[in-house]
Curated annotation (Swiss-Prot):
Keywords, in A-Z order: Cytoplasm, Endoplasmic reticulum, Metal-binding, Ribonucleoprotein, Ribosomal protein, Zinc
Annotated compartments: Cytoplasm, Cytosol; Cytoplasm; Rough endoplasmic reticulum
Cofactor needs: Zn(2+)
Name used for this protein in its record: Small ribosomal subunit protein uS14
GO terms for MF: structural constituent of ribosome; zinc ion binding
Assembly: Component of the 40S small ribosomal subunit.
Keyword Cytoplasm assigned: yes
Cofactor note as given: Binds 1 zinc ion per subunit.
Chain sites annotated for binding Zn(2+): 21, 24, 39, 42
BP-aspect Gene Ontology terms: cytoplasmic translation
Family in the record: Belongs to the universal ribosomal protein uS14 family.
Phylogenetic lineage: Eukaryota, Metazoa, Ecdysozoa, Arthropoda, Chelicerata
UniProt-listed PANTHER family: 40S RIBOSOMAL PROTEIN S29
């Protein structure tokens, strides 16, 4: 059994390892609210394009 069969063989159906940013595929700092599924870094970059407005 080679390492190709073992690597990433654990099922990722739930938990933080199963979700990733739809822009950069990062697992950390994920914003899931409203079904965004974008990490916080990409959200800051694309917030205006999505339609979010920064309030004072």
């Amino acid at each position: 059994m080679g390492h190709e069969n073992i690597w990433y063989s654990h099922p990722r159906k739930y938990g933080p390892g199963s979700r990733y940013c739809r822009v950069c595929a990062n697992h950390h700092g994920l914003i899931r609210k409203y079904g965004l599924n974008i990490c916080r870094r990409c959200f800051r970059q694309y917030a205006a394009d999505i339609g979010f407005k920064k309030l004072d």
